[in-house]
């Protein structure tokens, strides 16, 4: 396979804080990834000097995390690794304060979650206990539309590669993920040691009893032995090129001699020079003169591309971060007067009732929204109503809520445009709830500004 032919996929790694996520992820990146030998040697030397030699894979990841948290934008290639079939990007590993927010507003939707579970006595039980973080992360992944899952049973060396322990854990984990919403038949369960490397890239000789994993896919049965093969067996995502254009703006630049250049990531549809786009909720329509990525002109931009595009006769004052660009002739975006959403309260110290007005982070928009009405309390797993018009909801509850943005904002139903249909509720400097938008009441805005070039282009 040529280098260019590989599909890009995104994975998110979840699991309890001591499950060995960093070591396992570090190992994959280390062995098949974008870290050059020089950097590895430097890290190894530092780790040895600090007496952390045994910790080298996690150390690699810790170095990357520390640099990222200090705001040094390290080369993102460091979070990538290759399998025979895919280029894999690790979006984020939890434990990071903003993990939940990143997962929701994150630049990318994960195609698959890798759940790492520690096999050690007591460790496994702690990881999936009632209040376990693991449960929260798995539920979040499922709620946010990450429908594929791989389970890696880590630290098998601490159980002397016990087959009974492995089978006991699988039985429990199957029940656990079923409660979350996943179908265990479609999940690969792999016994590994992220630290020693067993069953990571090569089949281990330590578990002769292990015959390999198998899972059902749309195409039939898939089998394999290693974690790498399980990642390779992820079903390739369908990128939404056929949907109408949605491009949330990250920034708008004014570039001398060129003019106004909005920048953002195409979430759905395609963007081509000559197209007439509408920005919502600003309600400005204009023609796209050129599209570029990494300083190269593109004939068209597709979902996943971070592009800059030059628009005619629009000032930097007209459009801003959080606006969404779409095709003026194909379901153009519009501001939302109100919307209903399924909201899950994660950690709020008190009760949440009508009138609560926290800030919502949805795609690139960051806007206060009022919980206007709690319509019904629902069972998180089934989505069925358990109480009509509750007075309050608290941590752990899920409800259907009618929300009203404090100023115009552009959102969409999750089923139509997933990245514009999920949000994080931020309050007290943390994510207190997450939501998935069910329906949007689009404000019928008065006719907006249409530039001359757009009017001309429309006549063509």
UniProtKB/Swiss-Prot annotation:
Q: Where is this region: G1?
A: 15-22
- Any one Pfam family here would be GTP_EFTU_D2
Q: Where is this region: G2?
A: 71-75
Subcellular location(s) of the protein: Cytoplasm
Q: Where is this region: G5?
A: 193-195
Domain tr-type G per the UniProt entry, residue ranges: 6-241
Q: Per UniProt, what is one GO molecular function of this protein? A: GTPase activity
Q: Where is the PTM N6,N6-dimethyllysine found along the chain?
A: 3, 317
The record's comment on protein family reads: Belongs to the TRAFAC class translation factor GTPase superfamily. Classic translation factor GTPase family. EF-Tu/EF-1A subfamily.
Q: Which NCBIfam families match?
A: EF-1_alpha, PRK12317.1
Q: What is this protein called?
A: Elongation factor 1-alpha
Q: Which gene encodes it?
A: tef-1
